[in-house]
């Protein structure tokens, strides 16, 4: 493959980082996040990394991963460059996330798999294809199955057994085993990170004059990019405090803009097409309902010191099984329930349902979302795309029409309110 392909891999990240840095130049604490994200696209850094554990997606409970590995390396897709590297390795119907993730693991420019065990949750057909390709290429892979039901005791026990079996396999590779002490420490650490995520997003979404939507997404996703979860928490706390100070010192007059809720396929750095389109259409993101934000919303605590590790595992299995979205499942209640929670809390003007081509599990949920939104008088815009940028102009026209419709609705609402 040509070296220009690697340049496009890094250039995509550079372009996004440059845009976010320019638009948020007033935020001193943001610099660490920009540097952290860009490191993920540094060939020298990647060749030096040699992680022991590679995690595809965020379907596997973080509490389990941190109990048996100090520094899991997450692969979340998001890159058009890595997707191109995997074009010849995957069937045409493979979704962009899976193709991009495979490109991170098999490519001619860097190798992060040499000493690594790759773990993956089998939540879709594309994931099954990934496992086959990786094993054929000689990579070490351990898979965790997702049961087709999520509301039965048998499903929970099966899921718990899958977690424990996977943790034991990882522990043999990392030499850090699943003990009660390690599990409690991991639960405490992940809970702190999730609280910090929630505190930051709550502050950032009320400080829209000081930080852009793309910057908010980048900061939260650096939880998965940072070498150290503790370091991410430290810098996120500092940025949150900076935003709180700015909010108190300055009163910015903000233009009336429609607030939209994004749900569906995760929007992952560096491919920030969706927030770009939303901003260009004169709208703002009120919140995000995807697997990343849903994971951060889970509240799992270790309980009292007397609670057994087995009870903690039960709680982890129960919470994550209900939250996980799977194309093999009849109903995915996690995204729907979180959607209703966010709507009640934030009262968004509209919903943008982002679906990556091939991720049919989100299309399965769309009728339920649309029905609930219709009852609440909230318009829904379905946006299906991939990591390519050729459709930007077409999507921009459609998004601007959606934004204008929301604007007109808000104008009518304000007139009715004034005349009441």
Give the positions of each predicted feature:
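A short, acidic, amphipathic alpha-helical segment used as a generic capping/interface helix at domain edges
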Residues: 104-105, 330-347, 364-365
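Proline-aspartate-enriched helix->loop->beta-strand connector
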Residues: 115, 343-352
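Gly/Ser/Thr-rich loops at beta-strand to alpha-helix junctions
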Residues: 55-63, 121-128, 264-270, 357-364
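A charged, amphipathic alpha-helical module
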Residues: 2-52, 168-300, 310, 328
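Redox- and metal-dependent alpha/beta enzyme cores, enriched for Fe-S-associated oxidoreductases
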Residues: 56-78, 85-86, 261, 265-331, ...
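Acidic/His-rich segments in extracytoplasmic proteins that coordinate ligands and/or metal ions
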Residues: 102-172
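An N-terminal, globular interaction/scaffold subdomain
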Residues: 51-109, 116-117, 123, 130-131, ...
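Peripheral docking tails and interdomain loops at the edges
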Residues: 367-420
């Amino acid at each position: 493959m040509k070296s220009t392909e690697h340049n496009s891999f890094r250039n995509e990240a550079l372009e996004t980082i440059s845009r976010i840095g320019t638009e948020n130049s007033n935020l001193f604490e943001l610099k660490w996040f920009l540097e952290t994200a860009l490191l993920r696209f540094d060939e020298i850094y990647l060749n030096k990394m040699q992680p022991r554990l590679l995690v595809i997606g965020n379907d596997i409970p973080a509490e389990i991963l941190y109990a048996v590995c100090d520094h899991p390396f997450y692969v979340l897709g998001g890159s058009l460059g890595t997707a191109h590297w995997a074009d010849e390795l995957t069937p045409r119907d493979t979704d962009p996330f899976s193709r991009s993730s495979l490109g991170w693991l098999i490519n001619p420019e860097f190798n992060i798999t040499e000493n690594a065990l790759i773990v993956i949750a089998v939540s879709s057909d594309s994931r099954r294809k990934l496992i086959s390709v990786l094993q054929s290429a000689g990579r070490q892979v351990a898979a965790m199955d997702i049961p087709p039901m999520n509301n039965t005791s048998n499903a929970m026990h099966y899921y718990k057994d899958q977690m424990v079996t996977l943790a034991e396999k990882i522990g043999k590779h990392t030499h850090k085993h699943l003990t009660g002490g390690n599990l409690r420490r991991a639960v405490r650490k992940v809970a702190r990170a999730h609280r910090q995520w929630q505190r930051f997003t709550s502050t950032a979404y009320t400080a829209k004059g000081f930080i852009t939507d793309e910057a908010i997404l980048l900061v939260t996703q650096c939880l998965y990019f940072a070498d150290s979860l503790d370091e991410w928490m430290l810098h996120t706390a500092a940025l949150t405090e900076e935003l709180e100070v700015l909010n108190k010192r300055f009163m910015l007059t903000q233009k009336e803009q429609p607030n939209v809720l994004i749900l569906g396929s995760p929007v992952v750095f560096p491919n920030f097409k969706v927030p770009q389109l939303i901003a260009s259409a004169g709208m703002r993101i009120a919140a995000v309902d995807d697997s990343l934000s849903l994971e951060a919303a889970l509240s799992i605590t270790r309980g009292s010191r007397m609670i057994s590790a087995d009870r903690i595992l039960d709680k982890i299995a129960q919470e994550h099984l209900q939250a996980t979205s799977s194309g093999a499942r009849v109903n995915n209640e996690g995204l729907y329930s979180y959607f209703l929670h966010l709507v009640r809390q934030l009262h968004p003007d509209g919903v943008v349902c982002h679906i990556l081509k091939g991720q049919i599990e989100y299309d399965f949920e769309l009728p339920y979302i649309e029905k609930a939104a219709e009852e609440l008088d909230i318009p829904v815009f379905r946006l299906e795309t991939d990591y390519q940028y050729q459709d930007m102009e077409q999507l921009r026209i459609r998004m601007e029409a959606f934004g204008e419709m929301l604007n007109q609705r808000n104008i009518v609402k304000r007139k009715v309110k004034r005349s009441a």
